[in-house]
């Protein structure tokens, strides 16, 4: 109450911000006549003038009024569109690194040009981020003439683009692309072995279109670059036969083998279920008699079993995925679009493939990953636009430090939002939906029907076909026609069934989108110019009459077939109607069989229903029910926010490590001379090894000199008799031994460098270091994943899982760095070179150097080899056979995950075991 009183007296934070922005709008408007008086050449010259003023020390804020006035006038001349005052406010909000909430049809694409133009003047690049390739190409194509007129270049990043083209696109002043492409390019740039292969510049300023979709809806989905891992494909097929033999529990405490928790999207095996599963697996021969699924040796079986259960119980065809060209393609739960190239992790995708009987592809190993939260926080300045951000304003502020500013509409909204109608069953609900559509169609009112899944959209389509109503279906299966269908959804009597928010980003114009139709005529090569002009003229004459008919019929009518988990998605659907002051209406139809009501509002809602007890086919409209449903949505939003926040808290740990790794990697890539760094690494590696067997401040009796000598020989090819040093000099200590060993290694290394040439050795060192970092980082990511999956169990020991995760991750990262340094030092000091005359080596081009000892690899060949090959050759100079058969013959037992006996430091399965 006190808050409301304060708002009435002082105004809300949003009101105060708008008041400040309106003062700047007045300054921009005052410059309009001056800009209109300029010739095209003079207006274009303003860009060079602004750049010079910035170079002279002026700030972007200082030139904002003039820059916005120039952009507005250029837009009027080039595009025929003049920015409204509210659009100027939106541009300033974006420039200030905030989120502009603007209703559908208010011209967000045009708003972005103001902030993009101003920030592009700094010469550091601006990224405009959209949700798909079509919108990126479309928006860039529409706005490129404006930017070109103002002397700025535009690039577009789309999937399947070659690296050279990507470099050119990123080098442009303004770059359009999708969130996925920008994120993956960042990861790929941090995997290159040559700095000139990088495509991105610094991450300076980003304007994110549909910011809620990208920063909220996709925040739980990390970007992952992966490679194939060792995997048993047959096990997925075998496990796929197990779930049908297990009994699903009706309730959490009921009888059965497993409980499906739809809220948490998890499957939980009961005690009975474990026993039953063990019996089945024992009969199949996968589990030994009296063995347990919980034993360490059977972790893989448990992993595959749970993946199979989740695939059968939680993931459904045409809702969570579709089968396309013999492949499982994920459906985006928020937009209904197909996510080609995306795969579920942890064996789930393979389990779904086994369930559907399609080809099972190997599970992947993570090579690099980042969440959208952490990627977009890398930008110096971030801003965004959407029609619905206010419900998630707290999340934007707390996670991204982005304030949301609600921009007033240019014209008052005239859409009528009717109360929800609630039915007992889904059947009754869909009958009412068809009846409403039929009535709208009779009076010529266009209808957009929103569904939450492909399955429901096809159900509505079948009902409409049965009723004889012509319609278009827009779901993930119709992605190619998406924009065209949405553009014509405002025609007289049009009926469009859309999955979730598919088609978002394309305006629905009452009477139909004339531009799409005229573009289609102009592109028709079968028509002559005269025929094209005649058809376009006829089209333009007929459009106004159709537009007026739709206006009279009540504008676009929105029908929601169920409430979404988030109020924001509902608002997005409603927002498709009533653009720029047009009339429109919306209504949601619900049933007690809908997932939201069934899972989150069932008990109290059912009690209300029983009291009201309507007849079949009669809808309930009641404030109590509406509040109950909104309460359920808030619960789900809160739960989803907590999940995203938890993902971020855990990823923040990995993110700090990622920054260190990528920073070190970048330093190696860009440094001309890494000799000092290499010397430090060799010194540290030797010191650590000596400290292991001669601990500081320990007694001589505690030293293990024979093992130290063996390790030095194996790791660094140093044949030293340290025991004789100790006998010869009683005063010698660990530090003296370190200094002697380091001196020996440095002398030998200097001799090798002299033989092959400094540049060849530097290139070799750089390549070895990068590959060592990449391989060890990949192993570290896998270890972090395993740690993350099991860390929740620490809570049973009264420990905080997050604190435990941070502590263990820090220890693992220290081990990672030590491992990388030791690995590099060991490999580089083990390479031996033939004692050929230096002059002979120097006379030859680097690529032709063949002066390599017969037992050791050629450095130039090593530069092109994989890390496994590098290590294998360098650590096996005498050609010892480390195959499983040879080891067995020598009586050595080496398991796949044991260190390779060659001394490489890699696991056996990744070294000589892999080669075998």
UniProtKB/Swiss-Prot annotation:
Keywords: ATP-binding, Cell inner membrane, Cell membrane, Cytoplasm, Membrane, Metal-binding, Nucleotide-binding, Protein transport, Translocase, Translocation, Transport, Zinc. Transmembrane segments: none annotated. ATP binds at residues 87, 105-109, 507. Signal peptide: none annotated. It is an enzyme of class 7 (translocase). GO terms for biological process: intracellular protein transmembrane transport; protein import; protein targeting; protein transport by the Sec complex. One of its GO terms (cellular component) is cell envelope Sec protein transport complex. Zn(2+) binds at residues 900, 902, 911-912. One of its GO terms (molecular function) is ATP binding. It catalyses: ATP + H2O + cellular proteinSide 1 = ADP + phosphate + cellular proteinSide 2. SMART domains: SecA_DEAD, SecA_PP_bind. It comes from the Bacteria. Its EC number is 7.4.2.8. It is found in: Cell inner membrane; Cytoplasm. The keyword Metal-binding applies. CDD domains: DEXDc_SecA, SF2_C_secA. May bind 1 zinc ion per subunit. InterPro entries: Helicase_ATP-bd (IPR014001), Helicase_C-like (IPR001650), P-loop_NTPase (IPR027417), SEC_C_motif (IPR004027), SecA (IPR000185), SecA_CS (IPR020937), SecA_DEAD (IPR011115), SecA_motor_DEAD (IPR014018). SUPFAM superfamilies: Helical scaffold and wing domains of SecA, P-loop containing nucleoside triphosphate hydrolases, Pre-protein crosslinking domain of SecA. It is a peripheral membrane protein. Part of the Sec protein translocase complex. Interacts with the SecYEG preprotein conducting channel. Has a central role in coupling the hydrolysis of ATP to the transfer of proteins into and across the cell membrane, serving both as a receptor for the preprotein-SecB complex and as an ATP-driven molecular motor driving the stepwise translocation of polypeptide chains across the membrane. NCBIfam families: PRK12904.1, secA. Belongs to the SecA family. Monomer and homodimer. Part of the essential Sec protein translocation apparatus which comprises SecA, SecYEG and auxiliary proteins SecDF-YajC and YidC. This is Protein translocase subunit SecA. It comes from Neisseria gonorrhoeae (strain NCCP11945). The lineage of its organism: Bacteria, Pseudomonadati, Pseudomonadota, Betaproteobacteria, Neisseriales.
């Amino acid at each position: 109450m006190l808050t409301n009183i304060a708002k009435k007296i002082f105004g809300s934070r949003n009101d105060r911000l708008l008041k400040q922005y309106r003062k700047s709008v007045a300054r921009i408007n005052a410059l309009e006549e001056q800009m209109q008086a300029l010739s095209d050449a003079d207006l274009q010259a303003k860009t060079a003038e602004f750049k010079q003023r910035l170079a002279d020390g002026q700030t972007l804020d200082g030139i904002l009024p003039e820059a916005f006035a120039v952009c507005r006038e250029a837009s009027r001349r080039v595009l025929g569109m003049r920015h409204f005052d509210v659009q100027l406010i939106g541009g300033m909000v974006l420039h200030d690194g905030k989120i502009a909430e603007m209703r559908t049809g208010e011209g967000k694409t045009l708003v972005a040009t103001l902030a993009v133009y101003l920030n592009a003047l700094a010469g550091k690049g601006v990224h405009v981020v959209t949700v798909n390739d079509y919108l990126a190409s479309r928006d860039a194509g529409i706005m490129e003439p404006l930017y070109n007129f103002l002397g700025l270049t535009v690039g577009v990043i789309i999937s399947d683009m070659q690296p050279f083209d990507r470099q050119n696109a990123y080098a442009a002043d303004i770059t359009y692309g999708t969130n996925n492409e920008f994120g993956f390019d960042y990861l790929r740039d941090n995997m290159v072995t040559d700095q000139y292969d990088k495509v991105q510049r610094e991450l300076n300023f980003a304007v994110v279109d549909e910011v809620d979709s990208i920063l909220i809806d996709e925040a739980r989905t990390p970007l992952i670059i992966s490679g194939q891992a060792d995997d048993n494909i047959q096990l997925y097929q075998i496990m796929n036969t197990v779930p049908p033999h297990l009994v699903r529990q009706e309730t959490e405490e009921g009888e059965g083998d497993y409980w499906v928790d739809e809220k948490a999207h998890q499957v939980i095996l009961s005690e009975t279920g474990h026993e039953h599963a063990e019996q089945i697996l024992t009969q199949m021969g996968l589990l030994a008699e009296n063995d347990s699924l919980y034993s360490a040796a059977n972790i893989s079986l448990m992993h595959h079993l749970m993946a199979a259960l989740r695939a059968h119980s939680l993931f459904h065809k045409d809702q969570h995925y579709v089968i396309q060209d013999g492949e499982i393609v994920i459906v985006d739960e928020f937009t209904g679009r197909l996510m080609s190239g995306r795969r579920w992790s942890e064996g789930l995708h393979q389990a779904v493939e086994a369930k559907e009987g399609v080809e099972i592809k190997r599970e992947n190993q993570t090579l690099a990953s980042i969440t959208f939260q952490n990627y977009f926080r890398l930008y110096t300045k971030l801003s965004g636009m959407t029609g619905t951000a206010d419900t998630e304003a707290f999340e934007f502020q707390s996670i991204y430090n982005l304030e949301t500013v609600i921009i007033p509409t240019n014209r008052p909204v005239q859409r009528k939002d009717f109360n929800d109608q609630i039915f007992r069953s889904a059947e009754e609900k869909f009958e009412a939906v068809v009846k409403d559509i039929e009535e709208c169609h009779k009076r010529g009112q266009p209808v957009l029907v929103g569904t939450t899944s492909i399955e429901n959209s096809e159900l509505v389509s079948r009902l409409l076909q049965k009723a004889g109503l012509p319609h278009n279906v827009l779901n993930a299966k119709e992605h190619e026609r998406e924009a065209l269908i949405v553009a014509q959804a405002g025609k007289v009597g049009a009926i469009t069934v859309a999955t979730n928010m598919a088609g978002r980003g394309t305006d629905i114009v009452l009477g139909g989108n004339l531009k799409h139709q005229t573009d289609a005529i102009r592109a028709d090569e079968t028509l002559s110019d005269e025929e094209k002009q005649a058809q376009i003229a006829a089209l333009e004459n007929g459009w106004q009459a159709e537009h007026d008919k739709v206006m009279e019929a009540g504008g676009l009518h929105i029908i929601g077939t169920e409430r979404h988990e988030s109020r924001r998605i509902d608002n997005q659907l409603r927002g498709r109607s009533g653009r720029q002051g047009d009339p429109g209406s919306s209504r949601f139809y619900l049933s007690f069989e809908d997932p939201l009501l069934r899972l989150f509002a069932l008990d109290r809602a059912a009690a209300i229903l029983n009291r009201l007890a309507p007849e079949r086919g009669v809808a309930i409209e009641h404030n109590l029910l509406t509040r109950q449903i909104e309460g359920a949505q808030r619960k789900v939003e809160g739960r989803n926010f907590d999940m995203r926040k938890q993902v971020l808290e855990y990823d923040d740990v990995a993110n700090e490590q990622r920054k260190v790794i990528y920073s070190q990697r970048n330093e190696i890539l860009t440094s001309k001379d890494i000799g000092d760094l290499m010397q430090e690494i060799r010194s540290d590696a030797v010191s650590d090894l000596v400290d292991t067997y001669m601990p500081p401040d320990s007694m001589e009796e505690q030293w293990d000199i024979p093992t130290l000598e063996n390790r030095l020989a194996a790791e660094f090819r140093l044949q030293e008799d340290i025991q004789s040093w100790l006998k010869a000099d009683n005063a010698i200590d660990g530090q003296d031994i370190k200094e002697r060993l380091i001196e020996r290694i440095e002398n030998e290394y200097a001799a090798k460098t002299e033989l092959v040439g400094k540049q060849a050795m530097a290139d070799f060192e750089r390549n070895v270091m990068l590959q060592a970092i990449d391989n060890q980082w990949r192993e570290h990511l896998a270890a972090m994943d395993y740690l993350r999956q099991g860390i929740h169990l620490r809570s049973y020991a009264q420990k905080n899982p997050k604190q435990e995760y941070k502590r263990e991750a820090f220890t693992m990262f220290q081990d990672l760095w030590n491992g990388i340094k030791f690995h590099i030092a060991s490999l580089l000091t083990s390479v031996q070179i033939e004692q050929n005359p230096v002059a002979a080596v120097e006379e030859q081009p680097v690529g032709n150097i063949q002066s390599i000892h017969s037992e050791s690899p050629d450095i130039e060949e090593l530069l092109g080899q994989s890390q496994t090959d590098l290590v294998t050759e360098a650590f096996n100079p005498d050609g010892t056979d480390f195959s499983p058969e040879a080891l067995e013959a020598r009586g050595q037992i080496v398991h796949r995950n044991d260190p390779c006996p060659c001394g490489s430091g890699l696991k056996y399965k990744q070294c000589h075991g892999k080669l075998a």
